[in-house]
Amino acid sequence: MTTASPSQVRQNYHQDSEAAINRQINLELYASYVYLSMSYYFDRDDVALKNFAKYFLHQSHEEREHAERLMKLQNQRGGRIFLQDIKKPDRDDWENGLTAMECALCLERSVNQSLLELHKLATEKNDPHLCDFIETHYLNEQVEAIKELGDHITNLRKMGAPGSGMAEYLFDKHTLGHSES
């Protein structure tokens, strides 16, 4: 393996930030992988909640786009991308819509915490460009995603999920079926 040659465009980009960006890329790809697993679980013939499937597929694509945006940043700043193995999702059977939404909320909170730590590191390394990038492209979107998932969980519980299959069916049809996702 050859070592990467030093970048001619690198300026005020600390090695710790570069490494943290690579870790964040891996986390975003992991999140995409988890959402992909959720999507195809709900697409199964014995689950058949097509709007849950569409919702989670959309989330998977968003997370992959987040990873790609970070890769582009890494190259723009003169860093080097070092991809790691992507961990498999903790489960293959997502049980029901409520459980999947709860797992998604936990995942989004984890991604958000990692982004907050990345922002803190960028602040400590006096990297205003990285701070602005994270603020502009990630932080508000994470807060909105966390709120949306929290709302979905609340509404599913109010409807009687997971005990009521009808609740999931109606939520799939009327809430997720009419969302922008």
UniProtKB/Swiss-Prot annotation:
Fe cation 1 binds at E28, E63, H66. GO terms for biological process: immune response; intracellular iron ion homeostasis; iron ion transport; negative regulation of cell population proliferation; negative regulation of ferroptosis. Gene3D superfamilies: 1.20.1260.10. Its EC number is 1.16.3.1. The keyword Iron applies. It comes from the Eukaryota. Residues 11-160 form the Ferritin-like diiron domain. CDD domains: Euk_Ferritin. The keyword Phosphoprotein applies. The modification N-acetylthreonine is found at T2. It catalyses: 4 Fe(2+) + O2 + 4 H(+) = 4 Fe(3+) + 2 H2O. Its main location: cytoplasm. It is found in: Cytoplasm; Lysosome; Cytoplasmic vesicle, Autophagosome. Belongs to the ferritin family. Oligomer of 24 subunits. There are two types of subunits: L (light) chain and H (heavy) chain. The major chain can be light or heavy, depending on the species and tissue type. The functional molecule forms a roughly spherical shell with a diameter of 12 nm and contains a central cavity into which the insoluble mineral iron core is deposited. Interacts with NCOA4; NCOA4 promotes targeting of the iron-binding ferritin complex to autolysosomes following starvation or iron depletion. Stores iron in a soluble, non-toxic, readily available form. Important for iron homeostasis. Has ferroxidase activity. Iron is taken up in the ferrous form and deposited as ferric hydroxides after oxidation. Also plays a role in delivery of iron to cells. Mediates iron uptake in capsule cells of the developing kidney. Delivery to lysosomes is mediated by the cargo receptor NCOA4 for autophagic degradation and release of iron. This is Ferritin heavy chain.
